[in-house]
Design a protein with these regions (language model features):
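CN hydrolase (nitrilase-like) catalytic-core segments centered on the catalytic cysteine
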Residues: 17-142
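Generic detection of short hydrophobic beta-strand segments and adjacent strand-loop junctions
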Residues: 2, 143-148
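Beta-strand-turn-beta hairpins that frame and shape the catalytic cleft
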Residues: 1-18
Length: 148
């Protein structure tokens, strides 16, 4: 974690959001995965309660969006912001092949699954239209959000 201009950031790299789990018996609500370890749960609670902005960059676009959306919402509760972005190249692994094959698909830059932003448990929209660049086969998209 780190701070910029008084805002406290927490970075979860890619699959580190699996520190949360979704409880089916509670409507799929996200919770800290290791809540049976009281000391670890208390440490996580202290970290998350002292975070203003959660950044969760991912290597590939998120799967299981219902599960992940609940986690994004949970991480943004109580005034926090949550931001994630992904590469535009999606890897699809074929486990049924004799040798593992990885197929790479390029997602359109306007694909919803490349960027998510949440605040107070709700998805938020960028403050302006995304800026896109697709020259030299190096695609990227930039979105801007207002953070209070």
């Amino acid at each position: 974690s780190f701070s910029i201009d008084g805002k406290r950031f927490l970075v979860l790299d890619c699959g580190e959001n699996n520190i949360l789990r979704n409880v089916r018996s509670d409507g799929g609500r996200a919770r800290f995965r290791f809540d049976d370890d009281k000391e670890l749960a208390a440490r996580f609670e202290e970290v998350i309660n002292n975070t203003d902005i959660v950044l969760n960059p991912t290597h590939t676009a998120l799967g299981e969006l219902g599960v992940m959306t609940r986690r994004m919402a949970w991480l943004s509760e109580n005034g926090r912001y949550y931001f994630t972005t992904s590469n535009a190249i999606q890897e699809i692994v074929d486990h049924k092949a004799k040798k593992t094959k990885i197929k790479r698909n390029r997602l359109p830059l306007d694909s919803k699954i490349l960027h998510y932003a949440f605040h107070n448990g709700e998805e938020i929209e960028p403050v302006c239209d995304p800026q896109e660049n697709e020259k030299d086969n190096d695609p990227y998209r930039i979105e801007y959000y207002e953070v209070e």
